[in-house]
């Protein structure tokens, strides 16, 4: 078979296997849609913010206070995700999951040169995610006050279930990716089946394989078109 195929020949292969490509695309897309909407439970995220600012009380110590609090930012985030604090949240809300599982739902972050700590909790229940986030920051406020004598913890915003967006799964993106992958997979399979077929489908292919010139060809006479043809001896 000639390795240098023209665009017309490639298009003919795709057109010949168009039904197969279409069925694969529809099937994969429908399966992905079923998995996205019926199998995978949606995950929601509730967020809150905490400002940690401890001052010495002196008028000229504002800059040094901020620099010190920025250095303590990672420490505060570690305390917020500590097992002991997770156990307190678990007991407060009467949760059945383990402290390590609860810790995996909590994501803390802090922007550069900022004393604000962002706290996000992910859960399949938006109301539960907001409840965990609010309970966690309240426990954190008491924890740093008792253990570190830091009274500059301020909760800037409470997490609300009604504002919790669904972050997982990204249904539209996954559906588009499944559609594209199905189309590419169907086209790949169409070419694979074509190249596995060793039969000659044209006089040119036969001439290329044998190296002999083609002197003539016999047209394909369909059954419905040979009614008016009289055979020899009739």
Curated annotation (Swiss-Prot):
It holds the Pfam family Wzz. It comes from the Bacteria. The chain crosses the membrane at residues 20-40, 176-196. One of its GO terms (cellular component) is plasma membrane. PANTHER family: FERRIC ENTEROBACTIN TRANSPORT PROTEIN FEPE, TYROSINE-PROTEIN KINASE. The gene is yveK. It is a multi-pass membrane protein. It is found in: Cell membrane. Belongs to the CpsC/CapA family. GO terms for molecular function: protein tyrosine kinase activity. InterPro entries: Bact_polysacc_biosynth/exp, LPS_length_determ_N_term. Keywords: Cell membrane, Membrane, Transmembrane, Transmembrane helix. This is Uncharacterized protein YveK. It comes from Bacillus subtilis (strain 168). Its main location: membrane.
